[in-house]
Amino acid sequence: VGGPHCLMKDIKYAGVLFESLATHELTVYAKANDATVFHYNDSYGLEVDAIVQKRNGNYAAFEIKLGVGYIEEAAENLKKFQRNIDTSKMNLPKSLNIITGTGVSHRRPDGINVISISSLGQ
């Protein structure tokens, strides 16, 4: 009835499941580090999959993408998020990050971290 082959037929649904898994993993690591995970969505339709904020107010922004083919789109979204921050009211994020299902973790030339989900917690 089900199985991995069914998910490959519906890659959008697989992406939703991956986002849920990655958010769960971020939540586990956040709690262990006295931080909280939020979802960001503003009145202009800009969305960021996860914001991890420490008690002191420092935070990091995360986009979660199953496939590496969505990295550029995710990076542009994170940059737009950062550009829209009113720094008279809040600080910029300490880091911008993209969690992916595959690939090697690395820092892009623009400073955005691309993190393979298998690297979380290491």
PLM regions and their residue ranges:
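A cross-kingdom feature that marks ATP-driven nucleic-acid transaction machinery
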Residues: 1-122
